[in-house]
């Protein structure tokens, strides 16, 4: 490698590090100037202020539940995609992993429509809000389980399982799973669980829209951050932001540490085969794929249908009618928001600029 390449490589690392670290250092300096350097006090402030009470417990509880449900839903999908051959498999994989690349507000609006008065009509029951949030997180993160687990399942040499069937510890599916599959895939499952937990732990839009009265650390910070770092004005908000940031930093650091360990364990230590030889036909897998596809596309379909339902206000009441007025307003714009063409152009400019 030439000296110029080394220089530009080092320069890129320095610029990236500066862009990442310097804003954080400035923010921390301003917040600590107001709150003082007391990490224990920052964390204690979360339960001492009414705005942030119970946020720590709720954040951990919903993240753990979301992770468990995501694995329960996602692993069977990864199994049938990895072990069996399917027509239009790339299309199926794209559909099943689509939620992860969609804005989280899409998931929120989709599930609110499903649970609303024109769906299952359970939104008025506040006890369903928590479950709606957990299912929305699972919908959003099942792509992680598929992406982490499917490559392992789709490339393992089938001779291993055939040989294990001849041994006493491989007579049943459970014994084969225990002695062959689980040791091979548990690093991938754990890695997917770590990432799912982090995304659920730091969730904002889904929590803000679905569980209106409950808040995570992320949504609490967003609520009070406008007054943080200002001396003499709502100084407790600086404590809340610092405490929540510290907890999130420790969670993220722990997850990255676990991921680095699991990444080493996920390195290929067995003989791999081509997917063409590993995967077989199994029509029973459709009993997994069809419900999974329905689960993935249902929120999207509900949003599309909802975009054609418009509230019509009359003198004494309001009703919903089917109309394209919503699309017309989106395309033409108004004083409150730009037209669709301008918003799309801005998105493309920002995305290509960031990519460059």
Show the residue positions of the predicted features.
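Glycine-rich helix-loop "coupling/hinge" segments at transmembrane-helix boundaries
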Residues: 203-234, 315-320
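Short helix-to-coil transition segments within interhelical loops
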Residues: 84, 156-185
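A short amphipathic helical element positioned immediately N-terminal to and/or at the very start
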Residues: 1, 38-48, 178, 322-335
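Cytoplasmic membrane-interface regions of multi-pass membrane proteins
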Residues: 85, 120, 157-163, 264-275
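Alpha-helical transmembrane segments of integral membrane proteins
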Residues: 258-288
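Transmembrane helix boundary and interhelical loop/hinge segments in multi-pass membrane proteins
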Residues: 35-38, 148-162, 171-173, 201, ...
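Helix-loop-helix hairpin linking two adjacent transmembrane segments in secondary transporters
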Residues: 225-250
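Membrane-water interface segments at the C-terminal ends of transmembrane alpha-helices
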Residues: 4-36, 49-154, 184-211, 242-260, ...
């Amino acid at each position: 490698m030439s000296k110029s390449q080394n220089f530009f490589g080092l320069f890129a690392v320095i610029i990236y590090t500066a862009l990442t670290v310097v804003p954080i250092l400035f923010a921390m300096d301003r917040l600590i100037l107001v709150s003082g350097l007391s990490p224990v006090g920052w964390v204690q402030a979360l339960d001492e202020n009414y705005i942030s009470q119970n946020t720590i417990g709720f954040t951990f509880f919903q993240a753990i539940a979301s992770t468990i449900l995501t694995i329960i839903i996602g692993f069977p999908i990864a199994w049938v995609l990895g072990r069996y051959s399917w027509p239009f498999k790339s299309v199926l994989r794209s559909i099943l992993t689509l939620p992860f690349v969609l804005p989280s507000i899409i998931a929120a609006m989709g599930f609110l429509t499903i649970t609303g008065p024109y769906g299952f009509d359970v939104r008025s029951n506040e006890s369903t809000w928590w479950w709606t949030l957990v299912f929305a997180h699972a919908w959003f993160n099942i792509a992680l389980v598929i992406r982490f687990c499917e490559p392992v399942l789709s490339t393992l040499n089938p001779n291993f399982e055939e040989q294990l069937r001849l041994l006493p510890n491989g007579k049943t599916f459970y014994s084969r799973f225990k002695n062959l599959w689980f040791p091979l895939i548990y690093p991938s499952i754990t890695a997917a669980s770590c990432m799912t937990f982090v995304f659920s732990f730091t969730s904002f839009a889904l929590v803000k829209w679905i569980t209106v009265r409950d808040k995570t650390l992320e949504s609490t910070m967003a609520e009070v951050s406008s007054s943080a770092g200002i001396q003499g004005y709502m100084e407790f908000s600086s404590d809340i932001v610092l405490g929540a940031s510290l907890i999130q930093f420790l969670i993220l650091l722990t997850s990255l540490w676990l991921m680095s360990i699991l990444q080493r364990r996920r390195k290929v230590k067995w003989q791999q085969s081509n997917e063409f030889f590993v995967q077989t036909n199994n029509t029973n897998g459709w009993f997994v794929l069809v419900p999974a596809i329905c689960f993935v596309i249902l929120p999207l379909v509900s949003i599309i249908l909802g975009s054609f339902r418009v509230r019509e206000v009359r003198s004494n009441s309001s009703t919903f009618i089917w109309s394209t007025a919503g699309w017309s307003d989106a395309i033409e714009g108004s004083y409150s928001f730009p037209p669709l063409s301008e918003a799309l152009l801005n998105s493309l400019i920002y995305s290509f600029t960031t990519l460059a």
